[in-house]
Swiss-Prot record:
InterPro entries: PSII_CF48-like_dom, WD40/YVTN_repeat-like_dom_sf, Ycf48/Hcf136
Lipid-linked residues (S-diacylglycerol cysteine): C24
Signal sequence range: 1-23
Record key words, sorted: Lipoprotein, Membrane, Palmitate, Photosynthesis, Photosystem II, Signal, Thylakoid
Assembly information from the UniProt record: Part of early PSII assembly complexes which includes D1 (psbA) and PsbI; not found in mature PSII. Binds to the lumenal side of PSII complexes. Interacts with YidC.
PANTHER family tied to this protein: PHOTOSYSTEM II STABILITY/ASSEMBLY FACTOR HCF136, CHLOROPLASTIC (PTHR47199), PHOTOSYSTEM II STABILITY_ASSEMBLY FACTOR HCF136, CHLOROPLASTIC (PTHR47199:SF2)
Any one GO biological process: photosynthesis
Protein name: Photosystem II assembly lipoprotein Ycf48
Membrane topology: Lipid-anchor
Family in the record: Belongs to the Ycf48 family.
Keyword Lipoprotein included in the entry's annotation: yes
GO CC list: photosystem II; plasma membrane-derived thylakoid membrane; thylakoid lumen
Record carries keyword Isomerase: no
Amino acid sequence: MKRLLNSATQLLLVLVLGISLSGCVTTHVPTATTSPWQAMDLDTQANPLDVAFTDSSHGYLVGSNRMIRETNDGGAHWNERSLDLPDEENFRLISIDFSGDEGWIAGQPGLLMHSDDGGQNWTRLFLDTKLPGEPYLITALGSHSAELATNVGAVYETHNDGSSWEAKVTDAAGAVRDLRRSKDGSYVSVSGLGNFYATWEPGDSVWQVHQRVSSQRLQSIGFQPDGNLWMVARGAQIRLNDEPGDFDSWSKAIIPITNGYGYMDLAWDDDGAIWAGGGNGTLLVSRDGGDSWENDPVGDRQPSNFTRMVFDGEHAFVLGERGNLLRWVDNAV
């Protein structure tokens, strides 16, 4: 009898443990019946990192392993392109932007390229060896002008096609793991270890440092459409500024799911819905400001982490890994 009781107890413990572990991977959010996304396989092991367009139809996708693709139909099809770069260097093309036909590419190590013909030809610009950090984010500002930010928070501006650059910050922010720019030229960054974030506004000489709001390290941070901030922290926590203009005032943590995977990016579509992308095909949407969430059925089927989302007013993409890409087509499912 004692042996029988021990066996029954062990079986009960196994069942309880199994239920507990399965609970760790339950999303607790419903799956939407439709999706605006179309899954695309670029047939490459490279990771897409950024996308930009010269007009509604023509654009470029860049990424790791020197990847550059061109589209002439709004992103429905992507054709391989190449850049005139040394074969022995494996560049990561991190950022691309256009103002009309004038384009810029920033990459690592030490790569900056410029085009004045819609990307048909690219010229490499050799940067000063004393440049703090590596190119991280490039923004086209108009004719002959661009703004370059590095991975230590140095910000420079050119008005002569990159022949010379003027520093806009007297003291860099230090190593960053994420850095974003708003439409008005403000920046926000997350420190390399995720233990604080910093903001910079045009006219400031230095970055303003802000301590994280909880013990969870920060993953990424960016701007909402109204100019306030959003924050994603470890533990799948989302927070939004709850006082307009106060970058130290944050909402309580929003935790839509507890599936063991964190979020890597947050973005708003043109209808005001919030999209959260992250590990293992995590792609969630909230249409009520974060109160309730749905799981996207197309994203859920992708064997990829979603690292970035791009909404530019005319196009929308979710960038994954190893050639995985989602394109907004509206009601794909």
